């Protein structure tokens, strides 16, 4: 098999300028900060739960129970835990709805404005939710739900915008490697959020929210003044213009349209002619693009599992093994480390094969067995961290790949070549559908855990991972068949 052109003689690195590096870093850290603020909430759940429930007794004063309970939301830790799961669900549902809207807005307004507004506004809401309410000793379930709905809508501006900006600057050559490495932004944000939360948690959970909100607000200001959303802003040719000018430009990895006398076409592109559009495509048109619906449904199942680890892993470690909250926060970082390595390595392999679905399928198959192994992890931090890293590799890696490289492929496939106003919409559809699945999943996780225990939660994860494979099965079959035909043709030519 011949190596892709971008891997030969360092062609990929030489095609990048300092503008590409600046865009890579700014979008990377902007989404990292958004994820850090989300991670803060999951990392302080135990502290919040204690604050929202009354103490069993108080030896300093002998007062009636109603006095001690007057400033608390719930009579028991179990009810507080269930409400925390409800908040996760509320956030993800509003986040999912916001993704569909933000994708459309991002394709019609300046991406820099939308991203900066979302970051700064979300930071303010997080400050009010976690810090101001605690300083004022104001506890109200409906107020918390309302704030978290608004936060979900504001946070949804992030992913479609950053993926669209990256798609404007980085072409299909080496997209798996570049986006695989870049998609580690979510995992880096999780690590950053865990470290920030654990470092100030001893002073009170409100300071964890204060620190992450402040850093995120500052990041939004930097994005507003420093981000270039496309090469055209500084007089450089667009990615589409550069790629169309190359005589032997690479075939899109989601695109199965081969040369006319070549092999079986991929599932994702079924027309030979590119339709050139000028205006932003509609939501319905984006949904009808080949490959969008299968990957969206698959991502609904996969993101459910990935976000369950994101929201519940520190709580699981504290609840199931009795480890201290700060220790559980730091240990949960290893899941994100596995996701970073997995996303980058899987992206590289998919670039070499020039196909995404087979790589995704193999990783998800191994993810099932990694979930089985992690569910039986002993009460040993070293072994748990190792199994957690492996699980993150096979769950977080494919999740990063679908939400970044594959979404970019879908939004820039040949069927809509010449239209740069589709990427944010397509990304919003894929990630929005995934977030709906994740939203339903978070509430189910809390119910399953409360009634059946943690082992049944892992059985549920295994089922959802298997469903992910089923939804993209037609793409897997077509792309594997295409690879076999290519291999046979290569052997005949030799």
UniProtKB/Swiss-Prot annotation:
Membrane topology qualifier: Multi-pass membrane protein
Glycosylation sites: 58
CDD domains: MFS_SLC37A3
Gene Ontology, cellular component aspect: endoplasmic reticulum membrane; lysosomal membrane
Subcellular location: Endoplasmic reticulum membrane; Lysosome membrane
Transmembrane segments: 10-30, 81-101, 113-133, 146-166, 177-197, 209-229, 297-317, 333-353, 357-377, 386-406, 428-448, 457-477
Matching InterPro entries: MFS (IPR011701), MFS_dom (IPR020846), MFS_trans_sf (IPR036259), Sugar_P_transporter (IPR000849)
Region (Disordered): 240-261
Post-translational modification: Glycosylated.
MF (Gene Ontology): xenobiotic transmembrane transporter activity
A biological process from GO: xenobiotic transmembrane transport
Keywords assigned: Endoplasmic reticulum, Glycoprotein, Lysosome, Membrane, Sugar transport, Transmembrane, Transmembrane helix, Transport
Function summary: Unlike the other SLC37 members, lacks glucose-6-phosphate antiporter activity. In osteoclasts, forms a transporter complex with ATRAID for nitrogen-containing-bisphophonates (N-BPs) required for releasing N-BP molecules that have trafficked to lysosomes through fluid-phase endocytosis into the cytosol.
Protein family membership: Belongs to the major facilitator superfamily. Organophosphate:Pi antiporter (OPA) (TC 2.A.1.4) family.
Complexes and interactors: Interacts with ATRAID; the interaction is direct and both proteins are mutually dependent for their stability.
Protein's name in the database: Sugar phosphate exchanger 3
